[in-house]
Amino acid sequence: MTEELFSNSETCSLSDPLTSKTLSSIENPFDDPYILSEESEILTIKTDVLRPNILNRKSSFYPEADAPVRKSNLQVKKIFENQVLNCDGIKVAITIPDTSLIAGSLLHGNIWLSYEGAKNVETGVWIKEMFLDFYGILNFKGHSEPFYSISEKYSFCNLKTSALILSKAASASIGNKGLFLKCSCKVGFPFSFIVPLDIGPGTYHSSKLELLYYISSTLTLTSLDQNIRCTRCTIPKRVITSMHNNIAELYNPISCIKSLPYLSLEEAKTTLEVHTDRSLFFSGQIIDFTICYTHNHHRRIHNIKARLLETHIFHPNTQNHYGGYCMNQAEETFASCGYLKRYQKTKTKTRAKSTWKIANKSVYSNLAPTLKNTIHAQIKIPEFCRSVNLKDQLKIDYTLEVCFSAFFKPRILSIQIPITILHSWN
């Protein structure tokens, strides 16, 4: 059994594009579920080449800069619905670190191709090209729709033969059709993949909504009989959005004031003020805020209520049926021309609330109009809350609402402060 080494690909660094970064240790091929017989030959391709510029790649095995990527949601959805494609005698697997992916980081992994050639039979297979897809899927009430995708195409055609080191003759060769595998072997293709910063909100699970991410590898193969086949392997991956100090600024004071005059020509007799030191929180944290109010009005006010409101805004795809609505052919025609606004469904829920009773309920109290009462309030954010913005598909916004309420009028005077909730991965 012979181990061949192919040092022909590339790496890159996010911090300094001129700095070469070595790949993590390559996994033992026999740790993989696709174990070959002892007579099988192992060909390993290793990446340790400097990439001066991401779009100006110098090595021979590289993602093609001008290659078409899978921009269509229909293409990505087909990959999601057919996550595994098997060919006779050919299997593919992906090995990557068993950790969460962080937006903006550099991912190192290996794609393993296991080829079992028939004994005493002149067979072989050409590996022409490989697609590496990273995509996100929105699952809502049984419907699935891609919300993010990026793809890189790797070509095996016209590789430099000088970069291929073989200590044993002719188990693999390179031609204008790609990499030719003649007998049983296992090939490893290490890759370096930059996880984009704009990947969306990250992995998310709730009772009705899921945001899931997948990494998929699709290899295009051509056998000696010229039949083109594909083999694919897809694995789910947990994704975390990037947290930067300049983005997650903790101190950002906000103050809002509203008043309610007795008559339109009089001074304000009732005022409500809300102060908070932050507008950005993590799930599970406590929102600290201060309520200041004065009340000398003819209306009776019994208490002050504070609520954490969660608003879902859906923009359904015309091919799906979110909310039981689907555009007909005429509506789709007008929508494609820009004459029809996209259907929108909004739903608001209360995720947390608190109530404080007011001692001075009416104008007949001795409370002076200029005297302010202060309440130091808190509301705990549930662990599952997170702000989500999927552009034209889905938005989840959060608002802190503080209002005066009475028996027959729940909102006499209200203040709403928009807040952002990030998911805590601690």
UniProtKB/Swiss-Prot annotation:
GO terms for molecular function: calcium ion binding; protein-macromolecule adaptor activity; ubiquitin protein ligase binding. It is found in: Cytoplasm; Nucleus. GO terms for biological process: meiotic cell cycle; ubiquitin-dependent endocytosis. GO terms for cellular component: cell division site; cell tip; cytoplasm; cytosol; nucleus; plasma membrane. The keyword Nucleus applies. It comes from the Eukaryota. Keywords: Cytoplasm, Meiosis, Nucleus. Its main location: cytoplasm. Has a role in meiosis. Belongs to the arrestin family. This is Meiotically up-regulated gene 170 protein. It comes from Schizosaccharomyces pombe (strain 972 / ATCC 24843) (Fission yeast).
